[in-house]
Amino acid sequence: MNIIKIALFSLSSAFAIEAFAETKTLCVFDPLGAAGDSYNILKDYAINMKATGIDFDVKPYTDESVAMADFLSKKCDVVAAHDLRIRQYNKFSGTVSALGAVPSYKELNTVLKTLSRKKAAKYLDGDKFSIIGIFPIGAGYLFVNNSELDTVEELAGKRIATLNYQKDAIHMVNYIKSTVIPSDITNFGGKFNNGSVDICYSPAFAFNAYELYHGLKDNGGIIRYPLAQLTIQLLTNTDTFDAATRQKSREIMFSMNEQAMNIVMKHEKSIDEKYWVDLQQSDIDKYQEMFRQNRLELKEKEIYDPTLLTLMRKIRCKNNAKAPECTRADKE
């Protein structure tokens, strides 16, 4: 009898939560729509959020600009989009993808764990907008149509598909004296595949999602060095949820970090080893110093947030205390 009572109580409690749940719209950008990884991760997130009294209606978008426009016109309570798009609404969280700032997934886990804690809320909750969740979609790698383009010097003069709203990437391409070919998420893959550009950059999932193997052909390759750690971030108007719900959302999203990383690793491991190009340590050192100089310049231009740059430098130096940057006078 007691077991029956407990079961009935649990069932009634579940119905009570469902009955009083507040319905909100979560608009998700995923290039593959409802079949994509990001959409399905966020479907699971929505299930987990029901315990907080929020019932999300999750809607897929294959055009990121449309998803952002619908959010700004209040058709969506929350939008899930790349940090590169969301940086203008929260420079702190957008700095997670700063060039070369997070060289490994171990360090990325530490960064995201730190940002999910309550102490970070003051940086993520703004007067108008808030970030209520972040999850990884993988390191951005250079896809090159010639695998011998593996040093900084060899990139000079090459045509690089560059997202037209990504100020740090435009700065970097100009810095190495390459040619910016303005692009967006919908067409960068096509430009690489038809030879309009020599180089593009993206996480590993794009290899199949955008069929980048067509652009790699027989001589191309993927430089096995993370340019940046790309994430999907959940943006909402601060007054949409109370502070406790916003924080719980961030914690729930981070609790799914392993799930997201398993997908990232699945995509990276699915790419034939013949495409990967490993750098010499001397070239890695050049990339790291070049990225560091760019981050300092972009901090001065107020594109990157100095507080998060410092946090990420401390995490890097904890992982590699002998790195030259850790003792420099101009360290981040």
Annotate each language-model stretch with its function.
Residues 48-52, 70, 74-78, 82, ...:
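Structured segments of extracytoplasmic/periplasmic soluble domains
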Residues 23-140, 205, 214, 222-227:
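Short, glycine-/small- and polar/acidic-enriched structural segments
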